């Protein structure tokens, strides 16, 4: 992107992103399955002159993981040897903490930072030069071979590891499709967010496409509405969110639900607040999360419908 009136160029930051797997014709052939981690996506960039920086997938600098950066720098020459390059490289992965909420708080803190126990889970690698171009034509299977060969390096880094628990399936066969569903169930039961489905023959490309696909379960929760919040911006003067609180899945859940409504519903519900309060809403979410105070909330809650039978 070029800023007019100046002589410098603003770099565009990107990385490989996954498409949703539902209904995709690409869900055939040989695929690599791995757990979808519930952490912060991190691109650890090592420059040609041996400086390491952690970036978010949007290019925001993460300053709070120096222990990870230092461990990688301590093994920089070994990593270059396995990758067969002399310059910079990028480790693509996910930083994990004790919980997603705690990790996000620590990642953004300016002081009293406590990230020393976080672990960087690496699932891809590529030369920095190719990352800057937005494309590396090395097949996924070859990139994974590099990571596998690097196991002695990972063993030397207490807070940097390689994503484990992967399998290969052929989704063109009934056996492969059955294995995918069994694996997805196993990973979710183990506490992972879902699974990643990757094309073994695909290159690394810095954009969203079906080279990588993701599958996540959804959960429905039924909670009573205790009050309504007015919206802001274009939703000022009508419903912004339903404030819901109650017990479901054996947990005390409190959450504000601000999506899933049509404009007509926002207007109608706001005008009928006395009728809405006390009704039970069916809410779709990705996962039930625990707050620091021991209560629970929902990740990405969306209103589905009213459950007047409850």
Model-derived features with residue positions:
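Short beta-strand or tight-loop elements
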Residues: 27-29, 221-224, 240, 279, ...
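Structural detector for short beta-strands of small beta-barrel domains
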Residues: 218-234
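Charged, flexible boundary elements
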Residues: 1-29, 33
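Short, acidic/hydrophobic/Gly-rich beta-strand patch recurrent on exposed beta strands
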Residues: 241-246, 256-258
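Covalent nucleotidyltransferase
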Residues: 23-157, 295
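Amphipathic alpha-helical
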Residues: 164-219
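Intrinsically disordered, low-complexity regulatory tails
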Residues: 1, 103-120, 125-126, 250-310
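Short aromatic-glycine-enriched beta-strand elements
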Residues: 232-243
């Amino acid at each position: 992107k070029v800023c007019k009136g100046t002589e410098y160029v603003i770099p565009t930051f990107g990385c490989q992103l996954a498409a949703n797997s539902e209904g995709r014709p690409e869900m055939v052939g040989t695929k690599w399955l791995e757990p979808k981690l519930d952490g912060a996506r991190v691109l650890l960039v090592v420059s040609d002159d041996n400086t390491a920086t952690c970036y978010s997938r949007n290019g925001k600098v993460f300053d709070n993981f120096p222990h990870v950066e230092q461990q990688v720098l301590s093994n920089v020459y070994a990593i270059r040897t396995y990758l067969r390059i002399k310059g910079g490289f990028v480790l693509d992965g996910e930083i994990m903490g004790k919980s997603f909420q705690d990790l996000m708080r620590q990642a953004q803190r300016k002081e009293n930072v406590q990230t020393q126990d976080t672990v960087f889970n690496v699932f891809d690698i590529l030369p920095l030069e190719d990352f800057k171009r937005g494309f590396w034509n090395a097949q996924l299977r070859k990139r994974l071979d590099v990571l596998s060969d690097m196991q002695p390096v990972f063993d030397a880094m207490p807070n940097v590891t390689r994503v484990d628990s992967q399998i290969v399936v052929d989704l063109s066969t009934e056996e492969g499709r059955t294995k995918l569903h069994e694996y997805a169930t196993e990973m979710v039961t183990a506490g992972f967010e879902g699974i990643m489905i990757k094309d073994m023959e695909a290159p690394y490309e810095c954009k969203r496409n079906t080279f990588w696909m993701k599958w996540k379960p959804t959960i429905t929760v039924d909670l009573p509405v205790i009050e309504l919040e007015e919206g802001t911006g274009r939703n000022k003067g009508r419903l912004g969110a339903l404030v819901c609180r109650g017990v479901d899945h054996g947990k005390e859940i409190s959450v504000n639900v601000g999506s899933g409504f049509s404009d007509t519903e926002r207007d109608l519900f706001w005008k009928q607040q006395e009728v809405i309060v006390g009704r039970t809403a069916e809410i779709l979410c990705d996962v039930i999360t625990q707050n620091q105070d021991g209560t629970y909330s929902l990740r990405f809650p969306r209103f589905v419908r009213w459950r007047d039978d409850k």
